[in-house]
């Protein structure tokens, strides 16, 4: 069967830059699935994406499906014919469905009976006939939240479409996709190269587009060029470019022919906190800031043009003129804001609603202030500093700088607090109260910041759950999942002695009578334990290990983490599977027991050597392990408990638990309950698979 290279390119208006990669990757995944479902043999599927195009190139695509033999079994002979040998209605209906008459059917004999059988040789459809619908289906499945319609057409897509190129080798596959007739025409760069040209063979892509159209269609190559050129440009001025992955991706999605240039701004703007300058450079202008080797911002920035200019100084000058007013605004806001102390903004917080039922930002500030102080007392942080940080925590939201540059919240609070002469740990806490903002983000660096960050998040969790507005599906407008995971990460990774039970109760208490959900404390804790499940799964822990610990519902996160590590280690022990099975057996036996058990195991009632030996081991271990459990040394405890494998095996091999004599039976059940209680001090080992 012959094979050829296949190309599809959809030429569009400028595609959303933040969605470009996902659109291309989804297009490739969807089309690959279509090929596989159709049984079309193919090689590597490459995707290409630039601001005005999405393309796929498939190597070694078969020109048709393979022929195949089809067998359709019909009714059993007994049901296919009546007593006179005439075909039944069921047989005739089946035959019509196969396109034959009953007498043309074969018969299939097996040891279970005889049936009518239809065999046919089905010729595979041509790729040319199959591909148009496959492309259309793949495009229809793209993750596009909002579709556009253009002109008088009823066609909908993410952006208006101008060209559709469909080539199998050197042949155009005729089709109408997204309202456009397929052709071999490709559009180049808007201002460089050939605006439009034809491609003779799919193998020429993307090289022909690079050479004639001045477009780098390979997304990764374009991104790599920007990164390399920006690093070199920064090196030439003695600095290091801030090439964050998200901005690199966005810039690579904005240009077809990247040209990296270096510009500068006035040094006087460096008196403004670097975060505000960086915010406007990266967020508004898509520029890359440059730092010196000590991490200090330089009065330069790197940007990416989409054209090779004969006079790049004009482009540089233009960008410098664009950014200057934004930096001047930041300078003005910074100087204006510093004329007031942070706490002078407290009254204005009363004018901003946090949530309709939960009050204003001033109300939230009062709760955070109290809760941060309470948490500080629990973890050994400075209570006065934590309380002060809580009071000032939202004041920077009322400043000119944060109003204009919203992403500078927190960090500007830190700078203004330093200007006001606040304690350093208070100032740092104002910046770090929102950490961690995302997976892998840094945690608050000092105890006061930890107290404030936990207080802020717990206040939100208690309040929103308290009015019954917990997250549903993908909707989480108050970012409660992120808040819960943030609290857990801080407590676990900083090893803080906090209990979710008392922490949540205190957060709820501070709301007074505003909350309507009577089960708010349990709901918040259950939600946070659910976040634990997701966290540990991402860390690579097995589901049954997580369930074994969750079954005990430990509410101290640091303690939960210690149990997880202990059970995970226990699973590696030779005795683990046997003891897990034994615990499961004990659990089932105790679940079926209906008689009240004794408080203790009575040694005088023990008869068999195996039960006497098991009881002896339990007494020794119970006394030995109490300090382990008290100190949270769960891994050591489980290693000690692993020694029970032999006496437990002996017990089940030689002892009849449900003895006829009531006192012996109850004593043995009590012995098993004491065994189970020891393991349950750590986790429910019976849940391990």
Swiss-Prot record:
One of its GO terms (molecular function) is ATP binding. One of its GO terms (cellular component) is cytosol. One of its GO terms (biological process) is arginyl-tRNA aminoacylation. Keywords: Aminoacyl-tRNA synthetase, ATP-binding, Cytoplasm, Ligase, Nucleotide-binding, Protein biosynthesis. InterPro entries: DALR_anticod-bd, Gly-tRNA-synth_bsu, Gly-tRNA-synth_heterodimer. Transmembrane segments: none annotated. Its EC number is 6.1.1.14. Signal peptide: none annotated. The keyword tRNA processing does not apply. It is found in: Cytoplasm. Its main location: cytoplasm. It catalyses: tRNA(Gly) + glycine + ATP = glycyl-tRNA(Gly) + AMP + diphosphate. PROSITE patterns: AA_TRNA_LIGASE_II_GLYAB. Belongs to the class-II aminoacyl-tRNA synthetase family. Tetramer of two alpha and two beta subunits. PANTHER family: GLYCINE--TRNA LIGASE, CHLOROPLASTIC_MITOCHONDRIAL 2, GLYCYL-TRNA SYNTHETASE. This is Glycine--tRNA ligase beta subunit. It comes from Salmonella paratyphi C (strain RKS4594). The lineage of its organism: Bacteria, Pseudomonadati, Pseudomonadota, Gammaproteobacteria, Enterobacterales. The gene is glyS.
